[in-house]
Amino acid sequence: QINGDTVDINTAVCGGCGLCGAVCPSGAADVIWPSSSHLLNRLQKISSNYLRIENQMPKLLFHDSAHGAGIISYLSRIYDGLPHDLIPIEIHSTGRVGHDLLVGATAAGFSNVLVLCNPQKNIENETLYDQINLANAMVGEISNGKAFYKAIETNDPEKLNDELLKLE
């Protein structure tokens, strides 16, 4: 609800997914913890440390604490785990990932940003695809037409493994 120069969000209706912060172009709506600035500062530190040690840009994988963590754990037990240059970042909900975090991760030094999302969360995923398209359009001129950002929507660890093997 717009109230003068502020935006009021009814906490009784809030699902806690972070969609409001992901799609808000002004930053007026944001989740309380972790805030966008906290996440971006964290990503900057991780990326700069990785680059200093490995002498190459890392890739980033956002995932949620329930769905994503379980698939990644399974991948580690059954397959070879995640690629060595792919840094997993667990967040409460992948609905929180918007153009701010995607482009911010690129500015922080990540060469690609992937989002592992749950196929059963249609509303979150629809918004995520819109945000990925926006972010790819924003960086299109510097990417030579290559997409920096991609969602992987699956419950299948084998499909995730196959997608990760395609990374350059």
PLM regions and their residue ranges:
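A contiguous, basic/glycine-rich beta-loop/short-helix subdomain that forms a polymer-engagement track
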Residues: 31-54
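Iron-sulfur cluster-binding cysteine motifs and their immediate structural context
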Residues: 1-38
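Non-ligating segments of multi-cofactor redox enzymes
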Residues: 56-168
